[in-house]
């Protein structure tokens, strides 16, 4: 199943917490997504795979109301397409962009304090630092004193105290050392065990395979493949072909 046929034929899984159907989206005047459909069941890690320019980031931005889009986007049974981004965030959806957005002039502790609480049930500071022990030792360091891996950890950590339980993570392993990537994978598995739902954008299939329950492969703005984790081994070469430059 490939191309436009997959876009139309890949239904969202039953009881999806997030359901995207027939989504078209634009980045400026460029028409990036064409009839994209996918679903994210509660408590799962779902990965959007694809090479640069496939439309993965645009899909996340469309969910957050940051780009022009049409189609259907529902969260917990409620239509969110057309809502202001702050209202979408208020539903418990948090977006961690690839550029991380760490405030470099603020300390780690100040960065952690900055995001507003949107819902009850956020993780305590103590639990957040248990998940990211590197940050515990650097609470008084400014953002510009952190390594790339530590900045990524901080960008993710800031979400956890807000009460958001649905995380959109854009390329969290991009440019990071293997040992840091392993640590991020371990943290995502812990968050999943604690009830978080995660939509992940990745090009790193080796990493995604350690955390994901299902994969949607985007190619030229369309869903080319939907692969449950149980089928990845048998279809890995085909999936990898969509990631080759």
Regions picked out by a protein language model, each given a short descriptive name:
Residues 2-5, 11-245:
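Glycine-rich phosphate-binding loops of nucleotide-dependent enzymes
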């Amino acid at each position: 199943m490939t191309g436009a046929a997959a876009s139309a034929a890949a239904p969202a899984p039953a009881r999806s917490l997030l359901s995207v159907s027939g989504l078209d989206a634009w980045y400026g005047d460029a028409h990036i997504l064409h009839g994209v459909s996918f679903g994210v069941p509660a408590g799962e890690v779902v990965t959007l795979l694809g090479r640069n320019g496939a439309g993965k980031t645009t899909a996340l931005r469309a969910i957050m109301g940051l780009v022009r889009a049409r189609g259907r986007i529902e969260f917990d049974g409620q239509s969110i397409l057309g809502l202001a981004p702050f209202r979408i965030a208020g539903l418990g959806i948090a977006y961690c962009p690839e550029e991380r957005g760490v405030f470099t002039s603020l300390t780690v502790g100040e960065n952690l304090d900055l995001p507003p609480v949107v819902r009850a049930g956020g993780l305590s500071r103590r639990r957040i630092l248990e998940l990211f022990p590197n940050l515990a030792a650097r609470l008084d360091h400014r953002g510009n004193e952190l390594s790339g891996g530590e900045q990524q950890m901080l960008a993710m950590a800031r979400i956890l105290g807000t009460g958001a339980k649905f995380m959109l993570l854009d390329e969290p392993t991009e440019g990071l050392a293997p040992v840091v990537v392993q640590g991020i994978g371990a943290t995502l598995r812990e968050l999943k065990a604690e009830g978080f739902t995660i939509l992940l954008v990745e090009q790193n299939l080796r990493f995604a395979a350690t955390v994901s329950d299902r994969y949607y492969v985007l190619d030229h703005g369309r869903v080319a493949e939907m692969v449950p984790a149980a089928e990845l081994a048998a279809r890995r070469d085909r999936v990898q072909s969509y990631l080759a430059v």
